[in-house]
């Protein structure tokens, strides 16, 4: 008999809700075949809560299998082998599938169908999680509530969120996209203060 987590994995892999039952009507259905990408684990203590897969991840089926992933792994202080070890990290984007591009060629936001259907079930199936890394605004809004502080304000308050008495602390991070390279240069405290604590925490929970 499959355990509950494995059954949930298979349900998510079969999900086509954004194609077959889009929230805003069929004119807004997913323009391509969905390919849900998520990594759920009964052992990993760290949950990486991302945004949505990009095209390269859609093609490979591996989360963060791109330049953003390379930067994220550098932030975490882990190599690819450790990053894709289910016993170390669970990876649960806000939208499981590549949402497509907008008119300017940028990735669309995560599909709105995913989180209401799957997120609470997925989180409940992983009660061992001790830290959520909330990457980008969509994940931060879900896990922290709407902050109205922008990325700088939210990530800048990382100590407040990480060293909280909550059962599962949340550490907000900017998206590791190249588009945020300018922000990283303007905010040197991120590399000087936050990243050393992040790496120590990752080593403790996933080392």
Model-inferred region functions:
Residues 2-206:
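A polyanion-binding, active-site-adjacent surface
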